[in-house]
């Protein structure tokens, strides 16, 4: 049994060499995340070049995800680099201040905060480790009282409990970073803090314009991090190609206890709308410093797999941790074990579904046929990857091999659950193409003489969205 759930790993100082990256890819990485919150444009271009070269060396399809920083709202710097907030003491956030902060006051990089808050609001600093209660707003100053204290250092983030900050989803920096990401033709572009579908539509338009010189359009991932995004989940998903359950900032805004149920809801909705889902944040956090995960982390990864997520993501664990390779190995092993335990059946929400497209109906027909016949594999000849995406929405333990003539489609499909993307030559004749596809799978050891498999393709060949044929074959 091969692993169906994909692994997204973030590059950083701990994994920024071809040697380490190669071992991570061999250990199970399917998508490499470039975090645009850190580093310069050339750093990301160099890393993308490295990813392409190492993936080619390993002989594996690896996608690149460019993750935009978004409107991070932060305090400024302090005279001594940090202060200690004491519960019950006053503390001022000053949007006009240009001097370094001290024990009583701090500057802000977000000038609209005084307009966005009111007395009684709760502000959370440093990912919720520090809590302030707003007492008053006087001009550009937000006067607060420390509710939960601790150390506050330079440039730590600020969230408002329950949402309500009006910062736009796309900043000037993001717009420049989109141009950089398009220059190396990332397969996925992740947008931070979208509030609604309009934010995603704007990001897609900017990406498509920036990608025009390269004839490239990335798939768009919406990072669900804001309280305001929750009522608009369906619209955001429909305007995107997938979502990231970004549990860090989301938990700060909605509360830790609300996140597990939201995670399940988002993954289920993504599958129903034929979108991909990535589960992220602190999945193997202890492995930043420890060689093995905690039992709680093992359960967290396994439960995300059982929820039906397409991918589980590593952030600081592979970017800055001591054990990047071991973390990937552990995550791959956990995912595989969870998949063995899955109760596999044809989901009723898909079984009773009607389809308005021939290619989508063929994709679903292949799944049902393979499931009931006990086929060894499903082969999908696809130009754009849509057929493989539809197949991957259904949890089934029959492996899906997606064969395409398009390298960009091959890499994009690296994120799809239970899909093994392969590159094949272009054929105009359908029967020649079908025979070539079988030969590729036999040579890889995925099919043996006597095995049955379901195969889909379109006729005429080579047209995206043209899948109109399903055939069951036996290997001679």
For every predicted segment, state its role.
Residues 1-476:
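Non-catalytic helical/linker scaffolds that mediate oligomerization, partner binding
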